Swiss-Prot record:
Function: Key enzyme in heme biosynthesis. Catalyzes the oxidative decarboxylation of propionic acid side chains of rings A and B of coproporphyrinogen III.
Primary location recorded for the protein, binned into one broad class: plastid
Organism: Arabidopsis thaliana (Mouse-ear cress)
Transit peptide (first-last residue): 1-48
Record-given protein name: Coproporphyrinogen-III oxidase 2, chloroplastic
A molecular-function term among this protein's GO annotations: coproporphyrinogen oxidase activity
Length: 233
């Protein structure tokens, strides 16, 4: 059974979530890496989080949001969660359609998965294509519980803030595109929305939320015109 791991990176102005899958039965972790100088014991803070195992699905659901979110109007079509999920799933469709149009033949293979407690994702892979050696375009919707120490470390909060386990919601899309042509750069992007609920022992506390993301390309051979084009679009 596949498990889910997530890595969070912080900077003075950002808080970034990267998600991956691994075929192991080991615990799920959040790993925090701090770019600025901090005391060694806190440089790499690894904490277990409550994330359920994935279940393969035969078809895509209308939404990966929890039904119980409706009690808090979180699953309504106007909520940020629902709007962001719709946006990343639309983006996945458009990116895959554009890649397949260039390929003129090879198609993406799709895996859909969910979790009993809510959340899930769609993974699409194309490999050995005419243009792309391998292309992956994924979306995921995740629910979990963040230890208070992890939240404080990520947000540089004081020890008095956010007591108790912190329920969280995260949704995002990510992609890595490797072309066959070595003179063409590898492209990567990821965009996500992260939200924490009130701590379990402090009901009614304010919800925290933020967006993050970025796009980059990694050339094996640098061409100045490629760099200029990338930064102009």
């Amino acid at each position: 059974m596949a498990s889910h791991s997530s890595t969070l990176f912080t900077s003075p102005s950002s808080f970034i979530l990267f998600s991956s899958h691994r075929l192991k039965s080991s615990p799920n972790y959040f790993t925090y890496h701090f770019p600025r100088s901090v005391k060694r014991p806190h440089f790499d803070l690894r904490c277990s989080v409550s994330i359920e195992k994935e279940v393969p699905e035969t078809e895509r659901p209308f939404t990966f949001l929890r039904v119980s979110d409706g009690d808090q109007t979180q699953s309504s079509s106007y909520s940020v969660r629902a709007r962001f999920e719709k946006m990343i799933r639309t983006a996945q469709d458009k990116v895959c359609e554009a890649i397949e149009a260039v390929e003129e033949g090879p198609k993406f293979k799709e895996d859909v998965w969910s979790r009993p407690g809510g959340g899930g994702g769609i993974s699409r892979i194309l490999q050995d294509g005419n243009v792309w050696e391998k292309a992956g375009v994924n979306v995921s919707v995740i629910y979990g519980v963040m230890p208070p120490e992890a939240y404080r470390a990520a947000k540089a909060a004081t020890s008095e803030q956010k007591p108790g386990p912190i329920p969280f919601f995260a949704a995002g899309t990510s992609s890595v595109l490797h072309p066959q042509n070595p003179f063409a750069p590898t492209l990567h992007f990821n965009y996500r929305y992260f939200e924490t609920d009130a701590p379990k022992d402090v009901p009614g506390a304010p919800r925290q939320w933020w967006f993050g993301g970025g796009t980059d390309f990694t050339p094996a051979y640098i061409f100045e015109e490629d760099v200029k084009h990338f930064h102009s679009v």
